[in-house]
Every structure is written in structure tokens, then in C-alpha cells.
Regions:
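Post-transcriptional modification and biogenesis factors for structured RNAs
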Residues: 1-152
Length: 152
């Protein structure tokens, strides 16, 4: 177990959370808040519908610094250009030609790589996730099981 928050920040500093095509700015703020709670501070946004936004700031609560330091990109390729390991996420179980991991396996890959590499964890749009083309920019794909009736 980590002894203090500085160790957590050091451990997670190479990890970037990338949100693609976010349609509701409140989700950006909520993501920033969740990130900060977990010790993740690097946020990248790819073509968000609305950012910056009062709704994002309101939902972020004490994670305004994560929003203020967020980088905005026009495409996913640019957002992950500095990363050696790119993990695409999906609630759908897809047939893709690269490794599909469960969340535990994905966490193990991140832990192994974080010591020496920049890492991106990519989340897709609220309504349809990542496109196959966007998943093609990822080294790994993590399938996050969810309720089949509401897999947003």
C-alpha cells in the first residue's frame, strides 16, 4: 500500500486519461473529479462538444486544476502521440485483432508499463464509445463488463 499521496502522484504521473467526443460537459467535470480522487492528473480531451464549460467546472468540485491543465486535441492520434502504451476501453465485447483484456489484466499492464512509459487510457463517446478506427490506434483493448441494458 502506498504510504502517502506523493507516492501515488509519482506512480500515476505517466498515465493520461483521454476522453473522446464527450457530448456533455458535466461528464468532463465528473471525470476530472474521479481522476483526482484516484491520483490521476493528466486529462486529454479529443473534440469535446463543449469545453471549457461552467457545467464541467461545477461537476469537477475540487478538481478544477485537472480541468485547467487539460489538453484539447482535434484527433485521437495527436492526443496519444507521446504514449508508448495506449489502452482503449469498451463496454461492448468486440472482435478485434489485438489483445482484449479484462480490467484486472489491464491494471497489471499499466502497473508494469508505468515505471518506464507514458500511458493513455482512452474512453469513447457516451452514446457509442470508440470507433473501430480509434480502437485501431490502441495497443490493447480493455472490455469493461457492464449491465447489458445500460452500457454507457
Amino acid at each position: 500500500m502506498l504510504e502517502n499521496k506523493d507516492n501515488l502522484k509519482d506512480l500515476f504521473s505517466p498515465i493520461k486519461v483521454v476522453l473522446v467526443g464527450t457530448t456533455h460537459p458535466g461528464n468532463i467535470g465528473a471525470s476530472a473529479r474521479a481522476m483526482k480522487n484516484m491520483g490521476l492528473l493528466n486529462l486529454a480531451l479529443v473534440t469535446p462538444k463543449e469545453f471549457p464549460s461552467d457545467a464541467a467546472t461545477f461537476r469537477s468540485k475540487a478538481a478544477k486544476d485537472v480541468l485547467e491543465n487539460a489538453q484539447v486535441f482535434e484527433d485521437l492520434k495527436d492526443a496519444v502521440a507521446d504514449c508508448e502504451l495506449v489502452i482503449g476501453t469498451s463496454a461492448r465485447d468486440r472482435k478485434v485483432p489485438w489483445p482484449v483484456l479484462n480490467p484486472k489484466e489491464s491494471a497489471e499492464e499499466v502497473a508494469k508499463s508505468a515505471l518506464h512509459h507514458q500511458i493513455a487510457i482512452v474512453f469513447g463517446r457516451e452514446d457509442r464509445g470508440l470507433s473501430n478506427e480509434e480502437l485501431g490506434l490502441c495497443n490493447l483493448h480493455v472490455h469493461i463488463p457492464s449491465d447489458p441494458e445500460y452500457s454507457s
